[in-house]
Swiss-Prot record:
Residues 159-177 have a biased composition (Acidic residues). This is Protein FAM169BP. Belongs to the FAM169 family. Residues 121-192 are annotated as: Disordered. InterPro entries: FAM169.
Length: 192
């Protein structure tokens, strides 16, 4: 659900500053800390069974990158992402990424903001395919080059998401993730 009202901004602030900032963040870890989001920044809250369980923010194409820089974002950027710990490993991050990609169907390229928390680099436990497919297991790893004859190919996020969309192991459908209920044109992207 796109954040539009004052009440939704309050929910976003509580998720960001209180739940993540105080309750779920280990201050001894190198976890990321999110600053309060500008009213000008686009955000969506992830709802599950009536509770706000996460959010993501987007930097819009053409917006200034920062005060005094004069540089603008050249494409929409998937910026801040937060999912409450008790909802991890349920496919909600993938559902948010899919929603972000489907929000900008007219754009050929989309961006993902750096830096990422250590948790974002963890592969799903017990699934060696995730490690080899993404070729990274930690933020310090460099992407692995496929061996000759490996049969691997570079994939765009939309292609990979289409493959996992109907996968029963994906863990969550858009409706269960709280991203359904939006106009169908914003949730579906026609295949080429």
């Amino acid at each position: 659900m796109k954040v539009q009202s004052f009440g939704e901004r309050v929910v976003l602030f509580i998720l960001n500053a209180i739940i993540f900032g105080r309750l779920e963040r280990n201050l001894d870890d190198d976890d990321m800390f999110f600053l309060p989001h500008s009213v000008k920044e686009q955000a969506k809250i992830l709802w599950r069974r009536g509770a706000a369980v996460g959010f993501y923010t987007t930097k819009m194409k053409g917006r200034l990158c920062g005060d005094g820089t004069g540089a603008c974002y050249l494409l929409p950027v998937f910026d801040t992402v937060f999912i409450r710990r008790k909802h991890w490993h349920r496919g909600l991050g993938t559902a948010m990424l899919r929603d972000f990609c489907e929000t900008f169907p007219e754009d050929e390229a989309l961006g993902v903001s750096c830096s990422m928390s250590p948790a974002m680099y963890q592969a799903h436990p017990g699934n060696s395919e995730d490690v080899s497919r993404h070729a990274r297991t930690s933020q310090n790893d460099r992407p692995r080059q496929p061996a000759p004859g490996d049969g691997s190919k570079e994939r765009m996020c939309g292609e990979e998401l289409e493959d996992t969309k109907d996968d029963p192991e994906c863990g969550v459908e858009e409706e269960d993730a709280g991203l359904a209920g939006q106009p169908p044109g914003k949730l579906t992207r026609s295949s080429p």
